[in-house]
C-alpha cells in the first residue's frame, strides 16, 4: 500500500506555524491601541476610528526591505530588519500628516525556522512600538521550493488616519520656505544593491571598529530611523508645509514629490557633513557625488519644509525630541524644466 502522506511530508509544518504565533503574541500585545477590537488569530482584525476626528481620512502604505535582506541572511542578523519593515511604511504615510494606527506583515519562506521568524517579528513589534501603531495581524507563508533554505521575504502594510483639513499635500509651498533635514541612522533600507557591490569589491574587515563603538557591519545593518513621534509633535505645534521620506532615489528624487511644479529645493551641500559610512561608500565605490544623492539618503532621512518664520521653532522642537536637524536650504522659483532638487 502507498504510504500515507501528511502536509509536513510536503514541507509545511503547521505545528511550527502555531508555535510562531504563540511566540509573537506577547510582543504584539505590547503594541495594542484602544482602537483595536480583539486580538491576534481572527480571520480579520478590527479597528475603530476615534471619535476625536470630525472628517477622518485613512492613509495607507506598503513596502518591503529590499536587498538589505541578503545581508541579513549572509550575516545571520534578523533582529532589526523588522524595524526596517515598519519604518518604510509608517514614515511614508507620516509625510501626509497621518498618525499610524495599525500595521500588518507578510513573512514568506520555503521552510519555517521558528527562531529566525520570531526574531524578525519581534523586530516588527519593536518598530510598531517606536511608531505608536498596533501590530494587528499578518501572514506567515511557508512555501516549500519557493525560497532557498534560510531565506525569506517581507512585506509590510500600514494604515494611519489624519483629519481631512490637516492632510499635508505640499501645495502651499512657496519660494522662500525653509528646507530642513532630519538625520538618518545610516543607509536605512535603500541602495543596498550598490552597498553589496561595494562590499564585494572592497572586501573590508566588517568587524573592525568603524564609527565609535560600532563595527562597519553594525553601521551597515543599522535599522531605519522611525520619525513618527517627533514629527507628530511637530505637526501639533508648527504648521508643516511638506515632508519627504528619503528612500529609493535619495534626496534628489524624493524631495520633488512634495513640491509644486513651479518650485525647486535649493540645497547647500555644505549644510551638513556626509556621515562616515557614506564617505566610506563613496570612496570605496568611487561613486560620483550626484549619484550618491540620487541613490542614498546621505545622512538625511526626512525632509521637512516650513515657512521661514517657523524654521527656528521647528528646529528647536525637533531637537528637543532627539532629532538632529540640518537647515539644508531654501525653496526657490523653478527655471524652465530644471530638476526640482538642486544640490550644490
UniProtKB/Swiss-Prot annotation:
EC number(s) recorded for this UniProt protein: 6.3.3.1
Primary location: cytoplasm
InterPro entries reported for this sequence: PurM-like_C_dom, PurM-like_C_sf, PurM-like_N, PurM-like_N_sf, PurM_cligase
Superkingdom, taxonomy of origin: Bacteria
This protein's record includes keyword Magnesium: no
Biochemical pathway: Purine metabolism; IMP biosynthesis via de novo pathway; 5-amino-1-(5-phospho-D-ribosyl)imidazole from N(2)-formyl-N(1)-(5-phospho-D-ribosyl)glycinamide: step 2/2
One GO-annotated biological process of the protein: adenine biosynthetic process
A GO cellular component annotation in the UniProt record: cytosol
Protein location: Cytoplasm
Pfam families attached to this UniProt entry: AIRS (PF00586), AIRS_C (PF02769)
Record's keyword annotation contains Protein transport: no
Catalytic activity: 2-formamido-N(1)-(5-O-phospho-beta-D-ribosyl)acetamidine + ATP = 5-amino-1-(5-phospho-beta-D-ribosyl)imidazole + ADP + phosphate + H(+)
UniProt KW keywords: ATP-binding, Cytoplasm, Ligase, Nucleotide-binding, Purine biosynthesis
GO MF annotation: an example: phosphoribosylformylglycinamidine cyclo-ligase activity
Family: Belongs to the AIR synthase family.
NCBIfam families (alphabetical): purM
Name used for this protein in its record: Phosphoribosylformylglycinamidine cyclo-ligase
Organism: Laribacter hongkongensis (strain HLHK9)
